[in-house]
Amino acid sequence: MIAVGPTDLEIYLFHEGSLYKSYELFGAHVIKKNGMVGTRFCVWAPHAREVRLVGSFNEWNGTNFNLMKVSNQGVWMIFIPENLEGHLYKYEITTNDGNVLLKSDPYAFYSELRPHTASIVYNIKGYQWNDQTWRRKKQRKRIYDQPLFIYELHFGSWKKKEDGSFYTYQEMAEELIPYVLEHGFTHIELLPLVEHPFDRSWGYQGIGYYSATSRYGTPHDLMYFIDRCHQAGIGVILDWVPGHFCKDSHGLYMFDGAPAYEYANMQDRENYVWGTANFDLGKPEVRSFLISNALFWMEYFHVDGFRVDAVANMLYWPNSDVLYKNTYAVEFLQKLNETVFAYDPNILMIAEDSTDWPRVTAPTYDGGLGFNYKWNMGWMNDILTYMETPPEHRKYVHNKVTFSLLYAYSENFILPFSHDEVVHGKKSLLSKMPGTYEEKFAQLRLLYGYLLTHPGKKLLFMGGEFGQFDEWKDLEQLDWMLFDFDMHRNMNMYVKELLKCYKRYKPLYELDHSPDGFEWIDVHNAEQSIFSFIRRGKKEDDLLIVVCNFTNKVYHGYKVGVPLFTRYREVINSDAIQFGGFGNINPKPIAAMEGPFHGKPYHIQMTIPPFGISILRPVKKGSVKSFMKTPHPPSHGAS
């Protein structure tokens, strides 16, 4: 006989809210012991009168398949002395008022392909990983002073087959990984991959939190994809939604005829904006379910981080004109972060929070929520508003560029150009830019350069890397035919060069979260809409000079204050001909001149490209004084 029942400690911890590997108890598990084999099913249904197991193994007839109640708070269990791997199943739940519900398993490891909704008995173990080198490397490096440039994508619409069907997890490994490597992104971020019934929810209205969606293959297939990413040196971040869930009848909503996973009070329970239900984050069993879910994806899928969706929806009670703090959510998020960082200190926990909630990325012991990154939605909104302003009027909204530096170090920020900004009629980033065809591309190159040089880690949604004209069409693939056009190929070349520049020069990432890493040179030139600043690395004199021109005027012999008396070499210029520009670059090193300017002891004279950005580095081979007696003339063009 196989001992299959839960221990008293497991039951206690689950109902206390701290059974953080609850997936080892709940769900369907094939158990082999002493030459015997069987399948155990365990589910939490606190309001149920009866629970029966139905499936393909008993012709969906639950007679004689009653689960036994093993805790007074509603844990039910049954053991079937057969190996049921691969079989479909559901729970047939009799509610307190006598209704009968058919429910998928909240802890199922695999689910039927929509529109079907049954759970599948699946052996989640057994995949042989080959990412040991990646995991060792990750343990040695702190991400805060390393490059982090995320490529965000939706698995189902990045690329499709000729017949319109999806690429599988394994096929995407062959298609996507070389593309990401070619561009130089450090991580990919996948829109939610939990099982969800509606394609157009993009995974944000999930039901099967422990099931990798079967749209693209099996859970082991997804493990293969992530394994291949790691072998190629690419990190994988999952978009994760612990705040609310889909209300379809086979799922978590009113699971046993009454609120179990959701708040009991309708005002708190219903998420009217998205048509979903809010998790009851104060309920211990829900905390066990959700925190375990994060650990599950870390343990079995080796994910490198989570982008936690809609944090504001959790932090404040819903459906109110007044922002009331939800203390349950605060406690949940703090415990979540403490638990996952105890499991993996190098995990990325990224909050998507659109509010000014303080100390999101501060440690919990210091009163913070405990994330290590937060999306900088304020920066994103301000810079896009600025770029959409006609160039001749940008001088009147100068503060849209400068304001972000007043709070840039209040949190550890990621600068996101995400899917949210290129859908629902918002237009693509390229289409947001005003002006002619060429001016749109020039301003997008400028915007990407500014993204690269502004303090904070980076994120770009798929399609942005080649300047997609149309906004994201989630039922279609990206507009790959745009690579037939020079301007889009040149834009793509520019993005690749930006990524090379980003990884090559430490001032662009080493001190992202310290005021020591940024210094304005000229922040006051609103009339010409020109900004100049310094990015610094950890080593003294390891710096870059950045000059941005947000108008269509070109300037020759433009004076910029500099801190070092040496030559400066342009490392990238967005107006270079190979990027689709007009060649207003600085092809030769520029010598610093005596005489203070912009509050700096020396200055240079350079060409400032229209709608352009120029990044310069000091040449370290001796000072100007050692080899030059007269000022170097300014550069006036491109070769």
Swiss-Prot record:
A family per Pfam: CBM_48
EC number(s) reported in the record: 2.4.1.18
Coiled coil regions, renumbered to chain: none
Entry-linked InterPro entries: A-amylase/branching_C, Branching_enzy, GlgB, GlgB_N_E_set_prok, Glyco_hydro_13_cat_dom, Glyco_hydro_13_N, Glyco_hydro_b, Glycoside_hydrolase_SF
GO molecular function, a single term: cation binding
UniProt-annotated catalytic positions: 309 (nucleophile), 352 (proton donor)
Assembly behavior: Monomer.
Reported function: Catalyzes the formation of the alpha-1,6-glucosidic linkages in glycogen by scission of a 1,4-alpha-linked oligosaccharide from growing alpha-1,4-glucan chains and the subsequent attachment of the oligosaccharide to the alpha-1,6 position.
Family to which the UniProt record says this protein belongs: Belongs to the glycosyl hydrolase 13 family. GlgB subfamily.
The protein's name in its UniProt record: 1,4-alpha-glucan branching enzyme GlgB
Organism in which the protein naturally occurs: Geobacillus stearothermophilus (Bacillus stearothermophilus)
